């Protein structure tokens, strides 16, 4: 028996991928949300400008499209590692801005440049990096692997956020905000070094293409591939569903439902634990029965969650909204990684990097513009005393109904269109076979996968 032929030479690299994802997530925590707000407040940036910056950052997903033109840049390890390190170093420099002896306007310009540059570079390397590491994962174990990766990031992120929050609060209590910024900046640099190490010590699988297809020809084939766009549309439609409702739930919990910050923190922790604990079982299910069947289950659970929120009001909110939030956690345990895995199920290897990039860009745009479109409706209901068409309701109840309705459309699309596509998994699993006692949604197609 040839031992060397059966040795798994990428096992360590997959372990580094799990660590890489966790370190990158920790950095993202430090350059978004409350941490970023602390910096903008210290610089003197208005809440309005902060909101605009946040919006532009979310639109940075559009730069993922650049990866389509980098499809022939193999190997990717060297330039992805360099660019990723640069983008994270730029993020660290954000915490240096309050110390720079410049005017408020000049500090604002420097801050904006650092923030946008970091996110632009991060989006450019996102798809190539994912394609690099996911190519090291056995097709029969992708669901289980991505679940393990998510579990480490979720639990690790929860602990990291708690520790960093405690440290920053201690500095603020002592009146040393500059010390807090220094700790955050140094933390990003340390995480950047750890993150870069995981990339440097990981292996890259040799390119399977015997001949390099010219970029122009590859783009032509890419655009003509209707099946590719059918798969990407799942991620786009899900973001339309998700961002039509969830961005408005935060204020609903605090204002209308009257949740305390302590209660919100407890439910957030419970969300992370439930999502992490459900990731592995759902991943194993997908490995055995296909990601489409797993999405049928997860989308159905998400539908119940959104539908339940239609009835969540102050009198029952503490129970009902919390219950639906936990259901949402279960659903997201499978949905979150499914868009990547669907691409690896149905898209040709040479087109996967471009598909990942286009999926990230289009779904990001879809989410942003959906929230933008729904926002006036929310404002209208709130300004009219929580009534709509003469019916007394909270805006969040209506957007939940909209999300639930759109999700039914997505479920039909998944079964009528995507389930017909030819699966490209390199294994002999009957990917469309699903035990009848595990079915939550009736397969409206009811046809064997080609």
Language-model-detected regions and their locations in the chain:
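Juxtamembrane intracellular "pre-TM" segments in multi-pass secondary transporters
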Residues: 1-11, 204-233, 424-450
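Helix-loop boundary and gating motifs at the non-cytosolic
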Residues: 1-64, 68-71, 87, 92-95, ...
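Hydrophobic core of transmembrane alpha-helices in multi-pass small-molecule transporters
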Residues: 22, 90, 105-125, 318-335
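Transmembrane alpha-helix termini and helix-breaking/packing motifs in multi-pass membrane transporters
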Residues: 42, 69, 73, 95-102, ...
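Loop-to-transmembrane helix entry/capping segments in MFS-fold secondary transporters
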Residues: 47, 139-149, 261-262, 349-360
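Helix-to-loop junctions at the C-terminal end of transmembrane segments
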Residues: 63-78, 278-291, 378
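C-terminal ends and interior cores of transmembrane alpha-helices
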Residues: 85-105, 300-316
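Intracellular juxtamembrane helix-capping segments at the cytosolic ends
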Residues: 122-137, 334-348
């Amino acid at each position: 028996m040839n031992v060397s032929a059966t040795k798994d030479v990428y096992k360590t690299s997959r372990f580094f991928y799990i660590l890489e994802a966790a370190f990158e997530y920790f950095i993202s925590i430090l350059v978004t949300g409350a941490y970023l707000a602390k910096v903008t407040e210290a610089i003197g940036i208005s809440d309005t400008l902060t909101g605009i910056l946040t919006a532009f950052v979310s639109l940075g997903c559009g730069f993922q499209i650049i990866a389509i033109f980098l499809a022939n840049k193999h190997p990717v390890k060297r330039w992805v590692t360099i660019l990723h390190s640069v983008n994270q170093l730029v993020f660290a420099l954000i915490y240096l801005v309050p110390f720079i002896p410049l005017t408020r306007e000049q500090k604002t310009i420097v801050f904006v440049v650092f923030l946008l540059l970091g996110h632009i570079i991060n989006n450019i390397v996102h798809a190539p990096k994912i394609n690099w590491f996911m190519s090291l994962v056995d097709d029969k174990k992708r669901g289980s692997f991505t679940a393990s990766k998510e579990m480490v990031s979720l639990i690790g992120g929860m602990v990291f956020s708690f520790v960093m929050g405690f440290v920053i609060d201690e500095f603020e209590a002592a009146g040393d905000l500059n010390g807090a910024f220094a700790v955050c900046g140094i933390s990003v640099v340390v995480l950047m070094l750890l993150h870069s190490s995981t990339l440097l010590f990981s292996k890259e699988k040799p390119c399977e293409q015997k001949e390099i297809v010219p970029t122009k020809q590859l783009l032509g084939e890419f655009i003509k591939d209707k099946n590719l766009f059918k798969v990407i549309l799942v991620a786009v439609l899900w973001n339309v569903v998700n961002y039509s409702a969830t961005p408005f739930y935060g204020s609903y919990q605090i204002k209308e439902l009257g949740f305390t910050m302590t209660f919100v923190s407890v439910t957030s922790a419970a969300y992370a634990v439930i999502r992490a604990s459900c990731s592995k079982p759902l991943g194993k299910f997908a490995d055995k029965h296909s990601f489409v069947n797993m999405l049928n289950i997860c989308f159905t659970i998400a539908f119940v969650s959104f539908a339940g929120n239609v009835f969540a009001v102050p009198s029952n909110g503490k129970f009902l909204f919390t219950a639906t939030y936990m259901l949402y956690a279960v659903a997201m345990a499978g949905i979150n990684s499914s868009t990547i895995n669907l691409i690896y199920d149905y898209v040709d290897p040479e087109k996967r990097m471009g598909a990942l990039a286009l999926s990230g860009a289009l779904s990001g745009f879809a989410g942003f513009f959906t929230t933008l479109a729904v926002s006036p409706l929310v404002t209208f209901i709130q300004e009219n005393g929580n009534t709509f068409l003469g019916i007394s309701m909270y805006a969040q109840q209506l957007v939940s109904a909209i999300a639930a309705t759109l999700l039914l459309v997505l479920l039909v699309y998944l079964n009528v269109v995507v389930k017909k596509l030819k699966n490209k998994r390199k294994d002999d699993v009957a990917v469309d076979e699903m035990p009848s006692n595990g079915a939550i949604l009736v397969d409206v197609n009811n046809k064997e996968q080609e």
